[in-house]
């Protein structure tokens, strides 16, 4: 198995519920290490740029509004098969379909306010990490 890095966002709904620590604990208990992390309030331009691939979709405006509605925690996770492992921990995008014990089943409100984002491929992880972090901000552990 290969050590990978993946990108994660703890979204405004989860930050507002004060469950950041509980979510990070799930990552760490599953063998993922946080190698970069920061809380930030996304600007409209940052959210639009990050989600640019969805710009033509009907939900884009609502997504940008939600992601700018409060602070988020952006982080880089590292570990064996980090991308797949993180996606398993998150659960299905729609929390009603997420398996019991997953982050979204336990902390998400809806398909829109679904607590977390995680990269879905190595290419996406590289792009998303670079969007928020300079190489010097990511520290191997």
From Swiss-Prot:
Its main location: cytoplasm. One of its GO terms (cellular component) is cytoplasm. This is Nucleoside diphosphate kinase. The gene is ndk. Its EC number is 2.7.4.6. Its cofactor is Mg(2+). ATP binds at residues 11, 59, 87, 93, 104, 114. Belongs to the NDK family. Major role in the synthesis of nucleoside triphosphates other than ATP. The ATP gamma phosphate is transferred to the NDP beta phosphate via a ping-pong mechanism, using a phosphorylated active-site intermediate. SMART domains: NDK. Transmembrane segments: none annotated. It is found in: Cytoplasm. Keywords: ATP-binding, Cytoplasm, Kinase, Magnesium, Metal-binding, Nucleotide metabolism, Nucleotide-binding, Phosphoprotein, Transferase. Disulfide bonds: none annotated.
């Amino acid at each position: 198995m290969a050590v990978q890095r993946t990108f994660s966002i703890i979204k405004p709904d989860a930050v507002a519920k004060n469950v950041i620590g509980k979510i990070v604990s799930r990552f760490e208990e599953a063998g993922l290490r946080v190698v970069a992390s920061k809380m930030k309030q996304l600007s409209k331009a940052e959210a639009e740029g990050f989600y640019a691939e969805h710009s033509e979709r009907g939900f884009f405006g609502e997504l940008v509004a939600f992601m700018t509605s409060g602070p988020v925690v952006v982080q880089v996770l590292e570990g064996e098969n980090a991308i797949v492992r993180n996606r398993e921990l998150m659960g299905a995008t729609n929390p009603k379909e997420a398996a019991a014990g997953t982050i979204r089943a336990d902390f998400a409100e809806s398909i829109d306010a679904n607590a977390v984002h995680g990269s879905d491929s190595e290419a996406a992880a590289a792009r998303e990490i670079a969007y928020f972090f300079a190489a010097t901000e990511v520290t191997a552990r």
